[in-house]
Amino acid sequence: MASTRSIELEHFEERDKRPRPGSRRGAPSSSGGSSISGPKGNGLIPSPAHSAHCSFYRTRTLQALSSEKKAKKARFYRNGDRYFKGLVFAISSDRFRSFDALLIELTRSLSDNVNLPQGVRTIYTVDGSRKVTSLDELLEGESYVCASNEPFRKVDYTKNVNPNWSVNIKGGTTRTLAVASAKSEVKESKDFIKPKLVTVIRSGVKPRKAVRILLNKKTAHSFEQVLTDITEAIKLDSGVVKRLCTLDGKQVTCLQDFFGDDDVFIACGPEKYRYAQDDFVLDHSECRVLKSSYSRASAAKYSGSRSPGLSRRSKSPASVKRAGHSSAYSTAKSPVNGTPSSQLSTPKSTKSSSSSPTSPGSFRGLKQISAQGRSSSNVNGGPELDRCMSPEGVNGNRCSESFTLLEKYRIGKVIGDGNFAVVKECMDRSTGKEFALKIIDKAKCCGKEHLIENEVSILRRVKHPNIIMLVEEMETTTELFLVMELVKGGDLFDAITSSTKYTERDGSAMVYNLASALRYLHGLSIVHRDIKPENLLVCEYPDGTKSLKLGDFGLATVVEGPLYTVCGTPTYVAPEIIAETGYGLKVDVWAAGVITYILLCGFPPFRSENNLQEDLFDQILAGKLEFPAPYWDNITDSAKELISQMLQVNVEARCTAGEILSHPWVSDDASQENNMQAEVTGKLKQHFNNALPKQNSTTTGVSVIMNTALDKEGQVFCSKHCRDSSKSSREQTSAREAPPPPESPRPPGPPATSGCDPAGTWRRHRD
């Protein structure tokens, strides 16, 4: 009853009770003996509520009350923000009991770390003529400007709502006619607008915010409007978005640029923008976001500045698709006779290398275009896949003209997207064995087909239990299909960090696997040139044993003479590569020695305290090898002796892969069974970012398969000796003359057998 009366008090006025005519309980008046007539005598309406205490009389009509209760709609702008379209608020006494409550709600909606960081404390009229201090001063349909403590900034806020894309424009004005005319002109030139999802990444320090925006005829009315939408979504620290750049560094200048080949853009503010390499390189987290965004897209494209430094090439999940490139790949398979080093050389960048928190390597940028010529459509039954253009198989296998990939293999989802190749799940229909189908788009390799051909020709020749095998090869006019062995056990670091027990004997077995693969390759006069833990994958067998398999032959080549191309990964690069005096097969032995050192202590033998590449190279050239205590106190002298032989700066004194296999520490199990898993794992995580636990070990194997020779261009680096142009000229002459190789390659040995001799949980394949 009390709540009902409180509501009625808002609409009725309490007055003194007057006696009704004829009422028995009426009291005579005390003034002059005269009596006051009833309510009708005063023209008042009797109260519907008859109480012993009071009566209520209606003073306002229901229409007036309804008008008072109706919310007033007003638009609020940010002070000085000419790109903010304004926010419409419905203001009613029920929603906002006080003016302060409105300020709190406006702060929540309009304030962030860039705009109004101190909150909304003042409201101006749209012309700045006065301040609003109460809810009653807010009028229906008017606009207001919100500010903190700063003075009013004079801006034509009403123009922020661009009439070119407003849906509520009222007709009848000259401005409206002009807008309508402009709309008709724009419609005539908007045939290029097709529905497209683009990703915009804010410039600045990583990790960077990325937003996805759908562009179509309803959302992309003008270039300025799209910029405004991006500004509102991306929220740059420096304010509004002034320019957009593709991952190639090209500035977007018109609406049509959004509908080209590029799908990823970098948003830049009003600050002077420096085109640094880091801004156009996506790190691992950004690539994951983009991969999830475009996993259902019909095509993907990779681009961006090359990574000039020596670094681990972690592959981001995207591929490149260049429109207009339709060069045919030669269907004839020439025998491997070695690719000259001059063919593998690429222009050397002068920019410094970059790194990300998750990986010391750089990433290519990601782009996406339409589905023209996309390999995934072909794999799923397109006409191109129904023809096997090359009758020549791999390792003696033949495929008939009528043979199709889909008849023999069941093709699954995409499990890896690289710069120049896409990797899909692949299962043999007859055996159920899993493989990885690597699809290389020839259009992306235009002008550099010899690099791919060199890599594939080497893969055709090698067949060893410690090397990832090329199972089958097929080809169409637009794509190259490689059925590869799929290794799911992770890389070398994963094998150590994920195990519960890791001993010196396990490390000995790992070195045996690596040396076995190197002896086989060197017997074919093939140098790998990129031996590192990331390219050593763990193969797990049904009986619980494991072995290492070497992959990623993008830098591999046949040694016909001294090589001068400066390439590799800094930690594992041999001194003769840095010195540029010519090198051969034994650069792989040096890298294997560095890996052996890391396997036993968790950190590399040569390292820079300041993380400077020049310091690292100086230490490698000096070759001063130390076994610091206490990390090496429990390691056998036999292991230290082998490492010292593998890390000889003098190439002639350095041991060969065959000598590694015959060393007692490797062949006679002269190693100990002491568990050093915790110590080695701790140092690995301290010195190697890629040694951190991975969510999916299969991803590591897919990344190795996904690499191509074209991805290795970033690992052809400029050493400190390359600054002398005269020496560079001399080296080019020496490379053309091709003097005899520094070491005599052994004749190819017989194919390795599949027998194994268990050593702990690690297999040792005997050649």
Swiss-Prot record:
Which superkingdom?
Eukaryota
- Compositionally biased spans, kind Polar residues: 327-338, 369-380
Where do Pro residues bias regions lie? 738-751
Q: Where is this region: Disordered?
A: 1-44, 301-391, 721-767
Record Pfam families: DCX, Pkinase
Subcellular compartments: Cytoplasm, Cytoskeleton
Q: Where is the composition biased (Basic and acidic residues)?
A: 7-19, 721-734
Q: How is it modified after translation?
A: Autophosphorylated.
Compositionally biased intervals (Low complexity):
24-43, 301-311, 339-362
Q: Name one GO biological process term.
A: protein localization to nucleus
Segments forming domain Protein kinase: 409-666
Similarity remark: Belongs to the protein kinase superfamily. CAMK Ser/Thr protein kinase family. CaMK subfamily.
Domain remark from Swiss-Prot or TrEMBL: The doublecortin domains are involved in the binding to microtubules.
Q: What is this protein called?
A: Serine/threonine-protein kinase DCLK2
